[in-house]
Amino acid sequence: MATTMNAAVSLTSSNSSSFPATSCAIAPERIRFTKGAFYYKSNNVVTGKRVFSIKAQITTETDTPTPAKKVEKVSKKNEEGVIVNRYRPKEPYTGKCLLNTKITADDAPGETWHMVFSHQGEIPYREGQSVGVIADGIDKNGKPHKVRLYSIASSALGDLGNSETVSLCVKRLVYTNDQGETVKGVCSNFLCDLAPGSDVKLTGPVGKEMLMPKDPNATVIMLATGTGIAPFRSFLWKMFFEKHDDYKFNGLAWLFLGVPTTSSLLYQEEFDKMKAKAPENFRVDYAISREQANDKGEKMYIQTRMAQYAAELWELLKKDNTFVYMCGLKGMEKGIDDIMVSLAANDGIDWFDYKKQLKKAEQWNVEVY
């Protein structure tokens, strides 16, 4: 027996633009989108902010699920069907922007945008891969701009559920240099300013380091700062917003997300829906550094939040079906190591030696910048 629940996907936004498109309804056992163009919905009574919505219907099983069989580990490097570098910088694929919407509040320290590009099935990526973007124009030497890689923020089915779109989560880079001049990142500003209907040159897909585990019983610990949330949104959509014949997540997905302010939180409404749908399978903890502190008065960075669950995390790391993924600012890596050093030492284990073993077993996966 199956029932259908409404799972509207809402992206908090004060600025949004969209390109009329016909969304699709694929097989009834998977995610099903209503027909129509993208649109605004202004019903967030708490903040009064405008909300961009993609309405979806998620089919879920109400019967007791059949226990999943233990999945034999296969190296991601040898995983079948994973495509890399179908499109390269010299011959990129030209996609089209369907949607570009700002998903941080106006008072957030910096802008982050969610964008959806069509690829007509020509860039068949997996959750955890990246795509390259080549900004329009030329550099100061008169040459085309170099490729900039971005982690994919959508599942392999894409936000429209038809395997023909790819989504990115991009922060607009603007800073002041030593001479007091305002500098804008070429590719991030190109993307954040991209109008729906515009062409965009894409390369890839690339990468196998961050591919999500195939084991539906796995414990997946995700550590993200800012736009490092992108690959984990792709994981979580597959786990909780889609139904697949060959995959039903029965494990534990635990997300730690670090941001500076509440107004910088990304995809919070989606994560709230996931928690409501699968409270036993999904946990999320936020670390809001400019607004929260621990008992010692220290700012709440991602490693500070993790320290509150240190013993529990260490016990999970002892299991052979626990996988850790880290994506975002490189600075968080040392803080996380500092926590683990003392925990491992309590068991007479050298953390850095143990981490090497985890990496070799593909249970410790890092993509930082």
Curated annotation (Swiss-Prot):
Its EC number is 1.18.1.2. The modification Phosphothreonine is found at T219. It is a peripheral membrane protein. PROSITE patterns: FAD_FR. Induction: By nitrate. Residues 90-212 form the FAD-binding FR-type domain. NADP(+) binds at S151, K171, T227, V259, P260, S289, R290, K299, G328, L329, E367. It comes from the Eukaryota. May form interchain disulfide bonds with LIR1. The modification Phosphoserine is found at S188. Keywords: Chloroplast, Disulfide bond, Electron transport, FAD, Flavoprotein, Membrane, NADP, Oxidoreductase, Phosphoprotein, Photosynthesis, Plastid, Thylakoid, Transit peptide, Transport. SUPFAM superfamilies: Ferredoxin reductase-like, C-terminal NADP-linked domain (SSF52343), Riboflavin synthase domain-like (SSF63380). The keyword Cell membrane does not apply. The keyword Cytoplasm does not apply. Residues 1-57 form a transit peptide. Disulfide bonds join C187-C192. Its cofactor is FAD. It is found in: Plastid, Chloroplast stroma; Plastid, Chloroplast thylakoid membrane. It is an enzyme of class 1 (oxidoreductase). Belongs to the ferredoxin--NADP reductase type 1 family. This is Ferredoxin--NADP reductase, leaf isozyme 2, chloroplastic. It comes from Arabidopsis thaliana (Mouse-ear cress).
